[in-house]
Amino acid sequence: MQALGIKTEHFIIMCLLSGHAVFTLWYTARVKFEHECVYATTVINGGPVVWGSYNNSLIYVTFVNHSTFLDGLSGYDYSCRENLLSGDTMVKTAISTPLHDKIRIVLGTRNCHAYFWCVQLKMIFFAWFVYGMYLQFRRIRRMFGPFRSSCELISPTSYSLNYVTRVISNILLGYPYTKLARLLCDVSMRRDGMSKVFNADPISFLYMHKGVTLLMLLEVIAHISSGCIVLLTLGVAYTPCALLYPTYIRILAWVVVCTLAIVELISYVRPKPTKDNHLNHINTGGIRGICTTCCATVMSGLAIKCFYIVIFAIAVVIFMHYEQRVQVSLFGESENSQKH
């Protein structure tokens, strides 16, 4: 993983997010709720509002333009109110009847099946995407930007455009093109100098180099944002729909978040290799050293680009091809679609 410019901890985090997304997708497609809605209800005479699952012994009524809770983010909570009785006329006639104690006024609804597909799954995918952006920003900075630790730096010659240019020039033009490779070597020397200045006085360096500051800020924002989105996935354990979800769903959400936090913490506190050990590890002489460097450069560039292209292509194709179809088959048309 180090040859690809990715720490083992970062690779583990991407695998955990991917596994969590696959499990959530499987659970959403396989789960069958007898009643997929939960209701925020109160009695006729007024009282505390209580979220609860559907109860066959109760009569649920709703009033036009009378709701304490707005619909959630799934876009399908309205479907839970389609078959409810109108309370505008029924409540007045039922006050003096034996049905009085069984009537519940619905003040809010949640479609729990739609929540998993439209909220939980999308948050996991979004966290995966944002964390992937962070890793890409970080890899670019390891090649071109300043780093306080020289052990974090990787050779700019691993930049995939360098290899692509070399292949095109050798195959199509028939002669080697080395200007970009020489430029990247110059960039490497300049980067090392910038890293020394950055290590000596980071505040002044960031003040003098606004562009570098902006790029590093984007990297930090992507990292923090991905962590915040992962924390939001814990909402599955505290949403009103948690009444319908099995206990292992809530436990799994906590296990994933805690595991990600532990892995992130380990990546920060784990001792870094010293500069001498790092140089001794990467500087191998002779033909073996040349072959190792070339293979690492070529394979890292190809592997990282193929990884990104394949993953994003598959994600886009699946999302575009199946999302609307699955949503309609599971939940029917959304409220916005019906209005149009």
From Swiss-Prot:
Protein name as it appears in the record: Envelope glycoprotein K
Pfam family, one: Fusion_gly_K
Organism: Varicella-zoster virus (strain Oka vaccine) (HHV-3)
Stretches in topological domain Extracellular: 22-114, 233-248, 320-340
Topology of the protein relative to the lipid bilayer: Multi-pass membrane protein
Subunit structure, as described in the record: Interacts (via UL20 interaction region) with protein UL20 homolog (via N-terminus); this interaction probably plays a role in the coordinate transport of protein UL20 homolog and gK to the trans-Golgi network (TGN), and is required for the cell surface expression of gK.
Highest taxon in the source lineage: Viruses
Cytoplasmic side: 136-211, 270-298
Any one Gene Ontology cellular component term annotated for this protein: host cell plasma membrane
Function, in words: Glycoprotein that probably modulates membrane fusion events during secondary envelopment of cytoplasmic capsids that bud into specific trans-Golgi network (TGN)-derived membranes. Also plays a role, together with gB, in virus-induced cell-to-cell fusion (syncytia formation), which is extensive during VZV infection in cultured cells.
Subcellular localization(s) per the UniProt record: Host cell membrane; Host endosome membrane; Host Golgi apparatus membrane
Bilayer-spanning residue ranges: 115-135, 212-232, 249-269, 299-319
Signal sequence coordinates: 1-21
Annotated keywords: Glycoprotein, Host cell membrane, Host endosome, Host Golgi apparatus, Host membrane, Membrane, Signal, Syncytium formation induced by viral infection, Transmembrane, Transmembrane helix, Viral primary envelope fusion with host outer nuclear membrane, Viral release from host cell
InterPro entries referenced in this protein's UniProt entry, alphabetically: GK (IPR002567)
Glycan attachment sites: N55, N65
GO BP, sorted A to Z: fusion of viral membrane with host outer nuclear membrane; symbiont-mediated induction of syncytium formation
Family: Belongs to the alphaherpesvirinae glycoprotein K family.
